[in-house]
């Protein structure tokens, strides 16, 4: 790889990492190409990006955009995106199904280095749309119960009449 190619990769990664709210680094050693493609496809559906990058190039890009502090060793695959929950859900779900070959190593979330346990905890949280649905269900329940009660009262009065 020439110096110009490396510089281009670094600048592309910098631009991507600056706009991302979550960057997760995982070990993928021994994972088949078919499974890597499955990861990329599931990530693409949620607007999450997945790329294998050399550690030195990734480290330079991370340092240049102010997201340093992650220790990069061995083989790494980078998963990032603007939606923290989407990134963590993609990674955690894939780790569950490929536990022996795919491991979460470290992450950069909310401007700080995050542990594996934080990534897993974030992945279990409901998404924004799910939270809105829960809230609407809570708001709707009293009205629904009231109308059911009124309907039962009406039916009872019709039976007695």
Curated annotation (Swiss-Prot):
InterPro entries the record matches: Ribosomal_uL10 (IPR001790), Ribosomal_uL10-like_sf (IPR043141), Ribosomal_uL10_bac (IPR022973), Ribosomal_uL10_bac_type (IPR047865), Ribosomal_uL10_CS_bac (IPR002363)
Keyword terms of this UniProt record: Ribonucleoprotein, Ribosomal protein, RNA-binding, rRNA-binding
Reported function: Forms part of the ribosomal stalk, playing a central role in the interaction of the ribosome with GTP-bound translation factors.
Gene Ontology terms: cellular component: large ribosomal subunit
Disulfide bond residue pairs: none
Name listed for the protein in its UniProt record: Large ribosomal subunit protein uL10
GO biological process: translation
CDD domains: Ribosomal_L10
Coiled coil residues, start to end: none
Single GO MF annotation: large ribosomal subunit rRNA binding
Family: Belongs to the universal ribosomal protein uL10 family.
Organism encoding this protein: Campylobacter fetus subsp. fetus (strain 82-40)
SUPFAM superfamilies registered for this protein in UniProt: Ribosomal protein L10-like
Summary of subunit composition and partner proteins: Part of the ribosomal stalk of the 50S ribosomal subunit. The N-terminus interacts with L11 and the large rRNA to form the base of the stalk. The C-terminus forms an elongated spine to which L12 dimers bind in a sequential fashion forming a multimeric L10(L12)X complex.
